């Protein structure tokens, strides 16, 4: 299966696609470009909003408000009047770190992890912003906190710390939000590229973007094997998320950051937003359900 181009944006690091059912559009970000993108699939129009700091991931809060992780913390963005409010910053947030991927769990808690901007290993963390506004560190000694998602039927959480080359499965308590019993369920070969963003479909199967691998791979975490893949005409595939009216469109983001001049010539649409139509759909993204 091949992905098709939706928006030719040449993002530095496209990331964080988030489907907004209420407004019928897709939000996504360019981390190093410090931009929020808004894509209208009906009109095939993509517009962007520039910020003064990195924008790394998104969660819906209300019809006209988003929770955004930016370089140093959590922010509330008002789409209607283009205003930004800081909500929370980890006490141990060092200036050499930045936030990376984030997503709300089935109960509306927002999980977000960090990464070192200097390539240091095991300096980052995974946090959870609770419904009461408290911020809890879930895991330290992380290198590049990346893809995460939840199996709603089986009360499981899947998580990727990119340099480990692994997808790790946890038991997940939906009432408390706590996770336990980590178990690696799939390991990528170095030749596959680096596992980056991830989403789950309604069968409990995983879709993982491979940075440097030009693919999104379909993984069965129970049989611990690759089922299928989507070819993307861009080397650095960063993230994927379900959207569209039937939630069967997989939106895929890509990057240009590490590309050579030769690669840029051969992959002119790298950094763009792509999509693939799938038979099995995903879940509606859960908005942040806490108070800000």
From Swiss-Prot:
Cofactor binding: number and manner: Binds 1 divalent metal cation per subunit.
Signal peptide stretch: none
The EC number(s) this enzyme carries: 3.1.1.-
GO cellular component: a single term: cytoplasm
Residues that bind a divalent metal cation: 15, 146, 196
Any one Gene Ontology molecular-function term assigned to this protein's record: calcium ion binding
Protein name: Putative sugar lactone lactonase YvrE
Species in which this protein is naturally found: Bacillus subtilis (strain 168)
């Amino acid at each position: 299966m091949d992905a098709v181009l939706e928006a030719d944006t040449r993002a530095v690091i496209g990331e964080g696609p988030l489907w907004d059912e209420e407004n019928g559009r897709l939000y996504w970000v360019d981390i190093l470009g410090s931009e929020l993108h808004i894509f209208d699939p009906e009109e095939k129009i993509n517009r962007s909003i520039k910020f003064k700091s990195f924008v790394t991931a998104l969660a819906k809060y209300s019809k006209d408000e988003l929770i955004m992780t930016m370089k140093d913390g959590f922010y509330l963005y008002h789409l209607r009047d283009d205003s930004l409010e800081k909500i929370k910053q980890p006490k141990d947030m060092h200036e050499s770190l930045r936030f990376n991927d984030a997503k709300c769990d089935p109960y509306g808690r927002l999980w977000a992890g960090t990464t070192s901007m200097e390539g240091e290993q095991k300096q980052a963390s995974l946090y959870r912003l609770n419904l009461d506004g408290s911020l809890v560190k879930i895991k330290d000694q992380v290198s590049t906190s990346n893809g995460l998602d939840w199996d709603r039927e089986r009360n499981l959480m899947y998580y990727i710390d990119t340099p480990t080359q692994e997808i790790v499965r946890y038991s997940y308590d939906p009432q408390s939000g706590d996770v336990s019993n980590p178990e690696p369920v799939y390991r990528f070969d170095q030749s596959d590229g680096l596992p980056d963003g991830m989403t789950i479909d309604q069968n409990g199967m995983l879709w993982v973007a491979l940075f440097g691998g030009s693919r999104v791979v379909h993984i069965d975490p129970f049989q611990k094997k690759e089922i299928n893949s989507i070819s993307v005409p861009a080397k650095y595939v960063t993230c994927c998320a379900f959207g569209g009216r039937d939630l069967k469109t997989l939106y895929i983001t890509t990057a240009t950051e590490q590309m050579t001049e030769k690669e840029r010539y051969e992959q002119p649409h790298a950094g763009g937003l792509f999509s693939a139509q799938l038979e099995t759909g995903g879940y509606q993204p859960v908005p942040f359900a806490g108070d800000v």
